[in-house]
Structures are given as structure tokens and as C-alpha cells.
């Protein structure tokens, strides 16, 4: 049975994504932070069937920055991706007119900002969507949470209103991590992180390498470098597997013009369904 660590508590969207990727029969383990989730799968006692799953991108709110920062420092390799349709519910013991305060993860609060504004609700950020249901279950009726219907069932707190996201076409992309690498499938994506010198044309030189070798970039995102003010790391996804000869040559050329380069991993491209 696959063991999967994730950030959050039972009922979190990450747990649902893990079950979508591995199947319902998994040994899921919730942690307090993205770093803890990665570390749980990277201990000496972790077996080959121990994985970690992290959200990296949402179709409405964009990149999950804390997750990307944690990935920068892990020794694990990304071996898969999965897309999960996110269907937010307002959960609480009161009626909609009773609710004045709503608890949830900042990403979920952002994804439901129109509903929150329309009902003039005060927001309380929490570390996890499902965890917010656990928090409000014993609070007054004016307190509610934004989470999944699964969290409502697990913590036995009623759904006040379903489908409260700004956009019903709301998907979150997750990456799956392991101590082992993957082999080339023929339909792969690779994720890397790098930092360039703070000088004119430095980033363009890297991007030109991809362009000259006809490699399709599917994502590029900058994140502040935590060690040096006003310098940035770049998180990049591109089509292809790092074991491919052409990809290896490009990565070798890139490595000559960056301050650091980390290959997060290569994995089969997931369908958006």
C-alpha cells in the first residue's frame, strides 16, 4: 500500500488528490507544513512506496508559493502530477444569514473572494481547508469554513452552501514526490528551478536555449530568493524527460549560465479531467 504524506488534516484536498493519483487504498499521513510533508517521505526509514503530494498551482489563484519554496530545498524527485477539480463549500452549523466570519486556507479564501465580498464576511486564514472545519465545529453559529464536501462529512458539520468559488472551472495541480526517479514514458514534463546572474540578458540567454532546441515551456514563474534580497529563482516546466539526450544537452548548457540549477523531476503529463 502506498504511503503518502501531505500538508493538512484528513479531508484536505491534497488527500483527495493523492487518492485520485494512487487509488482509494492509500495510507495517508497529514503534516503541519509542506516541509514536514516532504521530510516525512525523505527519512532514512521511508520505504520506496512512501510518497509526498504537494499543491503547486491553482487555475484561479496561481502558484502556491510556499509549496514551491519547500520544493527548492528537498532531495526528493517529482515522479507524477495530477489535477483535482476543487469544489468549495461553505460549511457551518448556522444558516447563511447567521455567518459573519469564515475560516479557510488563504488560497481557498482567494478562490471564493466574490462570495465573501458579496456577503460581507470577515476572513480568518488557517493552515488548511479541512482543518478550518475542525476549528469551527465547536464555535458559534456565526463562524463557518470553506472546504470540501468530504471535510463536511468527516467532521460532521453541515454544508450551508455548495459551489461558492469565483469560477466553477477551478482546478489545482499537484506534484507527487518520491526518493526514486522515473523512466521516460514518451509523454513527459520536466520541472526545474534555477537562479541567474543579476545582469541584463541573463534570463533571456536561458530561454533562448530552450527556443533554439525547440523545447516547449509550459510554465515559468519567479520566486524571491530567500537568501539574497531582490534576486529571484525561476520555476520552469517544459515538455520532455531529463534523460533524453537533447534535454540533457540543454540542461548542460544552461548550467554554465546560472547560479544554481535544480532538476525537480520528470513525470508523465497528466490529463485535465
Q: Locations of the language-model features?
A:
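Domain-level signature for soluble enzymes in the chorismate/prephenate branch of the shikimate pathway
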Residues: 1-273
Amino acid at each position: 500500500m502506498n504511503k503518502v504524506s501531505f500538508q493538512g488534516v484528513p479531508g484536505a484536498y491534497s488527500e483527495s488528490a493523492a487518492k485520485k493519483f494512487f487509488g482509494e487504498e492509500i495510507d495517508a499521513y497529514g503534516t503541519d507544513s509542506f516541509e514536514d510533508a516532504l521530510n516525512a517521505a525523505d527519512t532514512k526509514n521511508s520505504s520506496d512506496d512512501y510518497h509526498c503530494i504537494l499543491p503547486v498551482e491553482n487555475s484561479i489563484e496561481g502558484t502556491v508559493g510556499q509549496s514551491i519554496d519547500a520544493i527548492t530545498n528537498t532531495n526528493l524527485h517529482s515522479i507524477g502530477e495530477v489535477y483535482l477539480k476543487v469544489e468549495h463549500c461553505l460549511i457551518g452549523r448556522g444558516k447563511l444569514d447567521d455567518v459573519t466570519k469564515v475560516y479557510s486556507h488563504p488560497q481557498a479564501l482567494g478562490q471564493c473572494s466574490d462570495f465573501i465580498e458579496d456577503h460581507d464576511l470577515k476572513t480568518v486564514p488557517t493552515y488548511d481547508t479541512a482543518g478550518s472545519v475542525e476549528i469551527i465545529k465547536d464555535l458559534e453559529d456565526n463562524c463557518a469554513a470553506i472546504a470540501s464536501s468530504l471535510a463536511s462529512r468527516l467532521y460532521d458539520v453541515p454544508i450551508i452552501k455548495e459551489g461558492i468559488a469565483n469560477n466553477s472551472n477551478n482546478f489545482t495541480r499537484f506534484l507527487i514526490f518520491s526518493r526514486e526517479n522515473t523512466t521516460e514514458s514518451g509523454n513527459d514534463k520536466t520541472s526545474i528551478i534555477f537562479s541567474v546572474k543579476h545582469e541584463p540578458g541573463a534570463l533571456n540567454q536561458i530561454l533562448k536555449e530552450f527556443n533554439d532546441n525547440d523545447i516547449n515551456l509550459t510554465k515559468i514563474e519567479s520566486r524571491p530568493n530567500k537568501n539574497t534580497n531582490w534576486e529571484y529563482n525561476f520555476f520552469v516546466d517544459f515538455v520532455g524527460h531529463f534523460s533524453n539526450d537533447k534535454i540533457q544537452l540543454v540542461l548542460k548548457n544552461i548550467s554554465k549560465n546560472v547560479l544554481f540549477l535544480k532538476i525537480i523531476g520528470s513525470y508523465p503529463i497528466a490529463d485535465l479531467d
